[in-house]
Amino acid sequence: MHMVAPVVWTPEMVRALPDDGQRYETVHGELLVTPAPRVTHQRVLSRLLTALVRYLDREPIGELLTSPADISLGDDSLVQPDLFVVDAQDAGATAWADIKHLLLVVEVLSPSSVRADCTVKRALYQSHGIPTYWAVDADARVVEVWTPLADHAVVERERLRWRPTVAASLFELELTTLFA
């Protein structure tokens, strides 16, 4: 029997895929495909985006961007986080390849993305030293907060807080507001 070698996906291969409404990413050569998000996902994402925009207006430490995006983390990984804050030194970049310094990455979990967001991509974000990663679970009404060296998440159930080292003030958001 002839064995076929598994495909190792590259960022270039992912960029060449058709724009068909699916989200395509690759992490260490594994292709991740997720369908369009649910309404709840988008509602939570909008509330979080609004709160972060207000915070970044007060604390101009970087720029908030959303997917679709092509964020390369290493030669074999291309991700599209739901929301991410780019450090001020990369703010204003005109090409995705120019974005190298992320302060915050946010994934709002969907049933189809839980494994990728909570294990595969979380480990990737940690290994690349992204200071803070939020896995937002609208169904459980919690946010897992991960940092690069953490073995376990801090699970926020009431209030989400974020204080980048370059910021003078604290970001705070009541989870009852986020999940209203």
Each language-model region and where it sits:
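Gly/Pro/Ser/Thr-rich low-complexity, intrinsically disordered segments predominantly at protein N-termini
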Residues: M1-A180
